[in-house]
Amino acid sequence: MRVTDFSFDLPDELIARYPMAQRNASRLLTLDGNTGTLADKQFTDLLGMINPGDLMVFNNTRVIPARLFGQKASGGKLEILVERMLDDKRILAHVRSSKSPKVDSIIHLDGGYEMKMAARHDALFELELLSDLTILEVLEAVGHMPLPPYIDRPDEDADKERYQTVYNQNPGAVAAPTAGLHFDDAMLEALKAKGVNIAFVTLHVGAGTFQPVRVDNVLEHKMHSEWANVPQDVVDLIVQTKAAGKRVVAVGTTSVRSLESAARASEGELKAFSGDTDIFIYPGYQFQIVDAMITNFHLPESTLIMLVSAFAGFDHVMAAYQHAITQKYRFFSYGDAMFVTKKAH
């Protein structure tokens, strides 16, 4: 398959630059993977689509304020975007400046903090914090929310809350698992009251999620790697859910990738998983765990639209996107959502 197969023209005004006033006020496009049938709904209608005994799996990563501003010793300005935290003092990061900082040079951050440029790894820089504080403490003090490039505005105070799920727990992501942004506490409680089981995995979304695919042939793409954790209690719930003939519903592509990574690492019987994953899901992939998914509308030619196409069928998904454009759905991180059921292979 060609990467350009996943292209579509999106009018600029359909890119959501701000979230809805209420989290669950978004629209929801449902797609039946088997038939391609579409239905226009409200996000709150999801309550009627998830059945008692179904298992919903959420990604509880917490977005860190991963964008830092500062200057080199020469006075040249630079911008740092954390890709991942290596430990309490060291980060792997993208650095934007007129000239790349040299190894062992000192970077002066806003707020008076200093970092040393420790090493370079291809396009990424390893930076070490020179302070008694931890990286997380410095990010919380002077970091900015790493809004995706297409939101195309400076971050605001409201983004600290709204570019974050209500159930976030484990700091480490530099992009939000956006399907989860639509859920508020009341909706989660309503799902539980209905008899729906709720479980949490962690995948720290990296900035690589916004990198364009730079090859023509889908098969040649090298996926970025991210840290994920699927604990044993979630594995047990999945096994029970499947045994009862109920569905595993993944909230977001990151939850899908976490669960399918666990399946890929297990031979035969599903096991807990913790570690880096570079799983790349594109049409032809056989899903082992996920039966339905909730996801936002993704960028053209992105690995995320490829994943959804693998799940519900390429033709069905591309037709759904054209429908969404015609019906003026809001796209990307702060936009509307889809509820998609799996196409039988």
From Swiss-Prot:
HAMAP family the record matches: QueA (MF_00113)
Protein source organism: Shewanella sp. (strain MR-7)
Catalytic activity: 7-aminomethyl-7-carbaguanosine(34) in tRNA + S-adenosyl-L-methionine = epoxyqueuosine(34) in tRNA + adenine + L-methionine + 2 H(+)
InterPro entries: QueA, QueA_dom1, QueA_dom2, QueA_sf
A cellular component annotation (GO) from this entry: cytoplasm
Function statement: Transfers and isomerizes the ribose moiety from AdoMet to the 7-aminomethyl group of 7-deazaguanine (preQ1-tRNA) to give epoxyqueuosine (oQ-tRNA).
SUBUNIT field: Monomer.
NCBIfam families noted in UniProt: PRK00147.1, queA
Family: Belongs to the QueA family.
Database matches in SUPFAM superfamilies: QueA-like
Its EC number(s): 2.4.99.17
GO molecular-function terms, A-Z: S-adenosylmethionine:tRNA ribosyltransferase-isomerase activity
Subcellular location field: Cytoplasm
Protein name per Swiss-Prot or TrEMBL: S-adenosylmethionine:tRNA ribosyltransferase-isomerase
PANTHER family linked: S-ADENOSYLMETHIONINE:TRNA RIBOSYLTRANSFERASE-ISOMERASE
Keyword Cytoplasm found: yes
Pathway: tRNA modification; tRNA-queuosine biosynthesis
Keyword S-adenosyl-L-methionine: yes
UniProt keywords, alphabetically: Cytoplasm, Queuosine biosynthesis, S-adenosyl-L-methionine, Transferase
GO terms of biological process kind: queuosine biosynthetic process; tRNA wobble guanine modification
